[in-house]
Amino acid sequence: MPTIIMDSCNYTRLGLTEYMTVKGVKKKNISLINDIAQLQNKCQQLKPGVVLINEDCFIHESDASERIRKIILQHPDTLFFIFMAISNIHFEEYLYVRNNLIITSKAIKISTLDSLLNGYFQKKLNLSVRHGTHSEVHPFTLSQTESNMLKMWMSGHDTIQISDKMQIKAKTVSSHKGNIKRKIKTHNKQVIYHVVRLTDNVTSGIYVNER
């Protein structure tokens, strides 16, 4: 199955290409592209197994996020990775925001990437496995209260203001903040903000558990 790498950085292209070839993907099956038009065409032509996208490639175009969203929806069997364009922040974790969409950064560990792509590589070797690690995939969700609170938090409200508006104790607000940080796997507010914004841009938003 083909692989697509959408990144304007030659160093990253080289690194990801080498990584994929070491894992057994032939170079002729790796497409290097720069923009969304190419991504759309290649996805339609090749039906890729994995697409690796640098957020920098689409954040500067006005309708780019909507186009990326449509591509992801149109290819449910393709595993998409979006590497956040976030500077001076070290984030080694990853988040499944949809069954076929992972948000991470270029600081992700090779061992983590290995585990996320393990099913894909097994499939390359014609082993009988489900696509990716989808049998174990559970996109992260927030409770309705956490979702409401996160919106206020990201809008600049502090704990006391959130406490007053939601009519809950400040201690409860702090507890919800802790849960959100745990689910997004970081204590860094800048990373949390970036993850939320990116998820809103390329999907319908973070899943909310309505129960």
From Swiss-Prot:
Coiled coil: none
Family note: Belongs to the RcsA family.
Xref: InterPro entries: RcsA, Sig_transdc_resp-reg_C-effctor, Tscrpt_reg_LuxR_C, WH-like_DNA-bd_sf
Full protein name: Transcriptional regulatory protein RcsA
UniProt KW DNA-binding keyword: yes
Classification via PROSITE patterns: HTH_LUXR_1, HTH_LUXR_2
Entry keyword annotation includes Membrane: no
NCBIfam families assigned: PRK15411.1
SUPFAM superfamilies: C-terminal effector domain of the bipartite response regulators
GO biological process, one term: regulation of DNA-templated transcription
Transmembrane intervals: none
DNA-binding stretch(es), residue numbering of this chain: 159-178
Entry-linked SMART domains: HTH_LUXR
UniProt function note: Component of the Rcs signaling system, which controls transcription of numerous genes. Binds to DNA to regulate expression of genes.
GO MF entries: DNA binding
Positions of the HTH luxR-type domain: 135-200
Keywords, sorted A to Z: DNA-binding, Sensory transduction, Transcription, Transcription regulation
